[in-house]
Amino acid sequence: QLERMERLEAPKNESGVAHISFEAAEESGKEVLQVHDVKLGYDLTHLLAEHVSFDVTKQHIVALVGQNGIGKSTLIKTILGRLPLLGGEIKLGANVSVGYYDQEQATLDPKKTVLNSVWDDHPIMPEKDIRSILGSFLFTGEAVEKNVSALSGGEKARLLLTKLSLEKDNFLILDEPTNHLDIDSREVLETALNEYNGTVFFVSHDRYFINAVATEVLELSPEGTTFYDGDYDYYLEKTRAEQEDYRAKASFETKTVEK
């Protein structure tokens, strides 16, 4: 690891808006993620969902939606191997490298400074380059010397995105990436994901964000998953139509029984 003797000034970002970009260093295979008949939960006595099956294809952006507490974050942690697989199969495709954004921000070390949080991951990168990248994410001047424990939720979110952008993975798994971000940063993140040459699987409650970036929507329920080939508006339109069909069928069956 290089000696860090000289303290350099981080270049100022005059615009006041973070510059976020992602680029995959290597291409993955066409099939990025395959999930087949997975049981979802913390243990077999407390299952959240069963028969979870879906595929994620290269360069698609898939939004995972569902009711609160249904297990969206649990599914992500199971895919990442942070929770045990209770049943079924999860398979990453050829040459897939995963970058993870944790909504709980637990992947950050609270004892490290902003600068060291990034530099420790890339020790051979010159300090001026690290500071320049941090500056583009609005960490300028003395802000890079702050401890992670002293950062706001928004600052931690930007630090996580800084680290993610430097990894150059080809499959980003993002758990509520817009939480804590201001409107300008959200819009920049939308652009960055739309220009990204890799694949994205993300959870969000922000329908505007989903509409701006998702190519497909995956709905998680206790009975499994349903894939919708479109944005959030398309998903709402299709689910509304399905509910109307269900109500019409139920009404018809009730009337038939009454006769």
Identify the role of each PLM range:
Residues 3-14, 247-248:
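Proline-centered turn/helix-capping motifs that create local helix->coil transitions or kinks
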Residues 16-18:
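A generic structural signal for short beta-strands and their flanking turns/coil linkers
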Residues 20-259:
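ABC ATP-binding cassette signature C-motif
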